[in-house]
Amino acid sequence: MGSASPGLSNVSPGCLLLFPDVAPRTGTEKAASGAMGPEKQEWSPSPPATPEQGLSAFYLSYFNMYPDDSSWVAKVPEARAGEDHPEEPEQCPVIDSQASGSTLDEHSLEQVQSMVVGEVLKDIETACKLLNITADPGDWSPGNVQKWLLWTEHQYRLPPAGKAFQELGGKELCAMSEEQFRQRAPLGGDVLHAHLDIWKSAAWMKERTSPGTLHYCASTSEEGWTDGEVDSSCSGQPIHLWQFLKELLLKPHSYGRFIRWLNKEKGIFKIEDSAQVARLWGVRKNRPAMNYDKLSRSIRQYYKKGIIRKPDISQRLVYQFVHPV
């Protein structure tokens, strides 16, 4: 993607904190706020200079988007014109707690999860158009990172934190832990980290459903592995756990804190965060109840199949692919 918008980091707070739905405070409120003292003043967003200007139009003009990227914004007035007669919202599936067994509950949970994921993907697509950035945080330039930070701060009413992440590109940002986010941004760092994880997961899901070059799809260990990322679809075949683990290992900038190579040539890897790896596997298989106990049992099944084994020097959560990458 392109470089940062000119002067993004030097914009005054009055320009950064624009919320069309936040009304300006009265003189009485300002006086009351001043009486609190500098230590007790709460951070509050400023209203836009032109209240009639929509947030979408503001971002397009501020970030100087390309004309062809902004054509979809013309539909906004039409949508507002129909606000007097809103359509009936879709109803979430009802989970029947009296149903026998857990099959119905799991099915309902999967439906809810699919609906939520769909809405998240739509929101991310909209943000990408507004900010002119890619959906994969690992590909962001330092300027793209600043745009995303500004957007997230506006969306979730967070105090500005752009200066704390200056000069960081997408790969560096994705490699940071939640604690590192908190150190750089004590107020809101955990929220930023959580939403970055959502963006990474969304990019991962979008990538695995898009067509790509053919990679290793064999279900046994009789063939060698190819370099590059695994095509999870494998011509319609369900993804196997060992393929999923390889996907994570091939994206160290996104998942290096969860799973990493100890010796790539020998195929030895370590699961650093078993709970997170299990959670990601549950998302991939659409199984919200997935945990590491279930995942580890699946890994042990590969011992007999000759796909994964324990290395010569056995260590906890350390495994070895029989046929190295």
UniProtKB/Swiss-Prot annotation:
Region of interest (Disordered), residue spans: 27-50, 79-100
PROSITE patterns on file: ETS_DOMAIN_1 (PS00345), ETS_DOMAIN_2 (PS00346), ETS_DOMAIN_3 (PS50061), PNT (PS51433)
Subcellular location, record wording: Nucleus
Domain PNT: 119-203
A GO CC annotation given for this chain: nucleus
Tissue/organ expression: Expressed in the accessory glands of sex organs including the prostate, seminal vesicle, coagulating gland in males, the oviduct in females, and in intestines. Expression is epithelial-specific.
Highest taxon in the source lineage: Eukaryota
GO MF assignments: DNA-binding transcription factor activity; sequence-specific double-stranded DNA binding
Alphabetized InterPro entries for the sequence: Ets_dom (IPR000418), ETS_fam (IPR046328), Pointed_dom (IPR003118), SAM/pointed_sf (IPR013761), WH-like_DNA-bd_sf (IPR036388), WH_DNA-bd_sf (IPR036390)
Record-annotated DNA-binding residue ranges: 239-322
Chief location: nucleus
Keywords: Activator, DNA-binding, Nucleus, Transcription, Transcription regulation
Pfam families: Ets (PF00178), SAM_PNT (PF02198)
Gene Ontology biological process terms, A to Z: cell fate commitment; epithelial cell fate commitment; glandular epithelial cell development; intestinal epithelial cell development; lung goblet cell differentiation; negative regulation of cell fate commitment; negative regulation of transcription by RNA polymerase II; positive regulation of apoptotic process
Record-stated family: Belongs to the ETS family.
Function: May function as an androgen-independent transactivator of the prostate-specific antigen (PSA) promoter. Binds to 5'-GGAT-3' DNA sequences. May play a role in the regulation of the prostate gland and/or prostate cancer development. Acts as a transcriptional activator for SERPINB5 promoter.
Assembly notes: Interacts with the DNA-binding domain of the androgen receptor. Interacts with NKX3-1.
Protein name stated in the entry: SAM pointed domain-containing Ets transcription factor
Organism: Mus musculus
Organism lineage: Eukaryota, Metazoa, Chordata, Craniata, Vertebrata
Gene: Spdef
